[in-house]
Amino acid sequence: DAQSLTYPCFCSRKDIQAAASAPHGNTGVYPGTCKSLSASDIIVAARQKSPAIRLRAAAAIQSEVGDFVIVRSDQLFAYQLAVTVDDLDQGVTEVIRGADLVDSTPKQVYLAQLLQPNRRKIDYLHATLMLDDQGQRMSKRDGSVSAIKWRQGGGSAEQLLAHLAFTAGILGVSKPINIVELIEMVDIHLISSKLSSIY
């Protein structure tokens, strides 16, 4: 039942970081501080602040992801739950996304199994992130060149595709290519070894 799978958590990010930095702490994994609170402890804590709701992770993934938030303390659904429900609702069977989201995958796989245990498993592939000349992740917030700026600077769509495909290891040389040519030559099974991971 849902109550045995979840519990309220009153920990702040600061509390969790402090626990993770303690000797023998597991960085990034919730230490379970609120997991065994009694009913009276929960009532007292709830008078001070609204709790988040954590899902008890299965033993197989406990050390990897720990118990994770599915409802935030502001009562909004957390990303992990929202995206999993959305994927299931849309009938998604394959997801290709950046390697920066690989830590979310076991959580979403676990949630999907709980919500729809007889459904076909979603396959995940995590693509290598695009890096700039200094080896830093390309992102708009860090001022990386956008596609619009690329075009304004005289770059063509074919040159941009070539640059991205070359950076990802799909092309051996960075020579202009159009989208139709690129689609025809891309086989996910052949390039999967150049991508970060398949889950």
Language-model region placement:
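Active-site cores that bind ATP or allylic diphosphates and position pyrophosphate for catalysis
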Residues: 2, 8, 13-140, 146-151, ...
